[in-house]
């Protein structure tokens, strides 16, 4: 869900992007769909049909907790999925966002993000929903990467002027706060194997630490509770 707060600032800093690598893309159709996240709650998927026949998608991440300054997800309320359904967001994707994006040539992600922010017209995406906007922006990024004939990671590196590197996996090994029924003040205790020799080695280190920690907790407290994010 941190990505949703990040998208609020994306268009405002479009001047930071290197645009000479961008290739224009024309979007023929925009569709919203409901998918389920890892907790079994709905989130938003946006599909963009491009004029060359390619379809790209973007999925909005969602979290159990929301920061005070985080952009606002659009949820239905009511009884379906505990009030977390996204039919309103899907309707706005299929109507307002589709009307904005289709039939035009787009050449930069900052251009698209700024247009989405203007269409929304509120602070924190309260009208369209940050879940609608971030899924659209992710799909649009994939569309522009496709137009440039680049994998997404390389396209991001080129427009930001950054040097690609393998990510370091982060493991959430203990949960507290809103993520667990305990008295821990910290919501997430995470480890990152920064000096691992490879991604496979980093994953092994994370798994070894997780299971060793579980054994210590079981020995000391007699049982294990499973937090909202697996810790």
PLM features: residue spans?
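Flexible, glycine/charged-enriched surface loops at secondary-structure junctions
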Residues: 106-112, 130, 152-155, 214-231
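Glycine/threonine-rich beta-strand-loop-alpha-helix active-site module
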Residues: 150-170
């Amino acid at each position: 869900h941190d990505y949703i707060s990040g998208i609020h600032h994306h268009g405002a800093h479009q001047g930071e992007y290197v645009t000479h690598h961008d290739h224009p893309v024309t979007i023929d159709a925009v569709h919203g769909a409901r998918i389920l996240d890892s907790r079994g709650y709905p989130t938003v998927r946006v599909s963009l049909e491009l004029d060359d026949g390619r379809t790209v998608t973007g999925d909005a991440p969602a979290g159990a907790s929301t920061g005070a300054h985080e952009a606002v997800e659009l949820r239905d309320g009511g009884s379906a999925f505990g009030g977390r359904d996204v039919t309103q967001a899907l309707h706005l994707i299929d109507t307002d966002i589709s009307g904005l994006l289709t039939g035009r040539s787009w050449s930069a992600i900052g251009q698209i993000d700024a247009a989405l922010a203007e269409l929304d017209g509120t602070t924190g995406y309260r009208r369209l929903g940050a879940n609608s906007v971030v899924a659209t922006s992710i799909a649009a990024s994939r569309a522009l990467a496709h137009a440039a004939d680049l994998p997404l990671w390389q396209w991001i590196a080129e427009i930001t002027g950054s040097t690609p590197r393998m990510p370091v996996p982060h493991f959430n090994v203990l949960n507290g706060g809103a993520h667990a029924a305990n008295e821990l003040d910290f919501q997430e205790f995470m480890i990152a194997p920064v000096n691992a020799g490879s991604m496979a080695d980093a994953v092994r280190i994370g798994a070894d630490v997780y299971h060793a920690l579980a054994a210590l907790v079981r020995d000391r407290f007699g049982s294990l509770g499973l937090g909202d994010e697996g810790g």
